Amino acid sequence: LTLFRAQKSAGTLPDTTADVSETAVTAALRFEPVAFEAGHLLEYDIAPGLSARGDGARLGQALAVLLDNAVKYAAPGTPIQLDAARQGSRAVLAVTNRGEDIPADKLPHIFDRFYRADEARTDGSSFGLGLAIAKAIVDAHRGVIRCESGGGVTRFIISLPLAAGKQERGTDHV
């Protein structure tokens, strides 16, 4: 149902501005105890003043999917990192964890519905919809989501166009 709603709303986002920085901080604060309980430290570096046209609660859902996956798949005792920065005319968010790589041949499929890169890594409670939901939400916000995985580091990156009037020159990199 969540995936259906995310896909259906692709052209019907509210004509409001979402505070991406606040959304990222809220997600970090929400997941700090979850990460801690799982033996991880959640670190975050969030630039202030990032905003995008759309729905902050929906963007928070997308971040929750990425943070939840990072907690599930991070190697024991390793930190999880959430970053948000301005890159030119875009707000870029990244969730990074250390652990087993997602194989390169699986990366093109990880945002497909019901796809799981490794059936052995699931506890049976997952249906393979989380990343599809995150992608549908990001797509609805005219953004891009991608994943890089290699060398024991997996990083999910969301890039969103900044709201009108918020596009400043900058070279902050995530």
Task: Describe the role of every protein-language-model region.
Residues H40, R142-G143:
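Conserved glycine-rich
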Residues A6-L13, S51-G54:
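Conserved micro-motifs of the catalytic ATP-binding
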Residues G77-S89:
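Short beta-strand/loop element within the Bergerat-fold HATPase_c
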Residues P14-T17, F36, L41-S51:
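Conserved catalytic submotifs in the C-terminal HATPase_c
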Residues I102-F114:
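Short conserved segment of the HATPase_c
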Residues G130, A134:
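Short alpha-helical Gxxx[C/S/T] motif in the catalytic ATP-binding
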Residues A70-V71:
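Short helix-loop "hinge" at the ATP-lid/N-box region of the Bergerat-fold HATPase_c
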